[in-house]
Design a protein with these regions (language model features):
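A conserved mid-protein helix/loop that constitutes part of the nucleotide-sugar donor-binding site
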Residues: 24-28, 180-196, 261, 304
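Acidic donor-binding loop of glycosyltransferase active sites
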Residues: 247-261, 275
């Protein structure tokens, strides 16, 4: 048989709605490659729940390397430790060009904790990272062959004329991420509670969207019950329908302190919606959110600072509108055609 142009080893979810950042990034890149080269030229192995059928997974993985001209792997931090050594072993027999589509910003810390991984990473012909500071941090640690591949989405971007001055007294805020404590969801709740108290009434509501891990279901149920007057959880949104969901909101809250944060995909959703982002100054968030320009940055684990940032936008509607317009201007930078140009060139070498 003719060899596939590229084989991709990644997490594509369990067949339901795709919600976590790793699966969304891998799925979007794969779809764009299939659109450009045809599905018959792109081979895929899904690493989701591979432990349920390990023999079948290993065989498919081996065949992917054997039958592809170039092989890309898209692991997050846990998968890296399992899948990269396995890929290197299989590739010993075939010597394919290897690509690491890096998910998040975990690699610098992983190298610091496990310096032996540096040699393994330098066996890749190309590593595609999400932000310039991730690239710099990896280069400082001796990693080579680094390219840029930011997050990307093909969305129905709002028009500039849609961004009008919001004069409503009552506003809606949202959290649009995995619903877990290290994403700052409890800080967001506390901040909205504080903001309403300072405003002297129930003027701000908060909606959660995103994947809810089973280990957090009980805790979220408690939070929803305790804050029923202003808090709701709406489940998972299709990754290509985010603009339609986010349009009614005043701002997005992202008070994360998750250890593997890189380029959060929800920023691209906010850019295409023209939605101001209030985010923590954590890891690589400042690569995408410029304080006072297209969002506001706050310290981590600080509901009071988050409350102050919410009220800053609430009380200065012209600032809110300008930040929204600035965000909308950034959307074009994260369209698939612009983002994947270098990646396509590497594949076609």
């Amino acid at each position: 048989m003719d060899k596939y142009k590229i084989g991709i080893w990644g997490q594509y979810g369990d067949g339901g709605k795709i919600a976590d950042g790793q699966a969304v990034r891998t799925t979007i890149i794969t779809q764009e490659l299939q659109n450009k080269y045809g599905k018959e030229n792109v081979c895929v192995v899904n690493t989701n729940n591979w432990r349920k059928h390990p023999v079948k997974f290993l065989w498919r993985s081996f065949r992917l390397v054997a039958n592809s001209r170039k092989v890309a792997i898209a692991p997050a931090d846990n998968g890296f430790k399992v899948f990269v050594p396995l890929l290197m072993f299989f590739n010993f027999f075939y010597c394919r060009k290897l690509i690491d589509i890096v998910i998040g910003g975990y690699l610098p810390a992983l190298i610091d904790a496990n310096p032996s991984y540096k040699k393994m990473l330098n066996k890749f012909d190309a590593l595609y990272v999400q932000t310039e500071n991730i690239r710099k941090d990896l280069e400082d640690r001796g990693i080579k062959n680094i390219h840029m591949l930011t997050n990307l989405k093909r969305l129905n971007t709002r028009k500039v004329e849609d961004i009008v001055l919001n004069t409503e007294k009552e506003i809606k805020l949202c959290v649009f991420s995995r619903i877990y404590k290290d994403k700052g969801v409890e800080d967001a709740i506390e901040a909205v509670k504080l903001a309403n108290a300072k405003l002297g009434g129930q003027y701000i509501t908060l909606d959660f969207y995103g994947l809810l891990p089973k280990t957090y279901e009980e805790r979220l149920a408690e939070l929803l019950k305790d804050n029923v007057s202003f808090l709701k959880y709406h489940g998972i949104v299709d990754f290509d329908k985010t603009v339609e969901t986010l349009t009614p909101y005043f701002a997005m809250l992202f008070p994360t302190y998750y250890h593997g944060e890189g380029f959060p995909g929800n920023f691209v959703d906010a850019f295409n919606t023209g939605l101001p982002v209030i985010a923590t100054d954590w890891l690589y968030n400042k690569d995408l959110i410029k304080d006072g320009e297209n969002g506001l940055l706050i310290p981590i684990n600080n509901p009071e600072a988050l409350c102050d940032a919410i009220l800053k936008l609430y009380n200065d509607r012209q600032l809110h509108q300008q930040i929204a317009l600035n965000n909308l201007k950034k959307a074009a930078d994260y369209g698939p055609d612009a983002v994947l140009k270098d990646f396509y060139e590497f594949i076609e070498k």
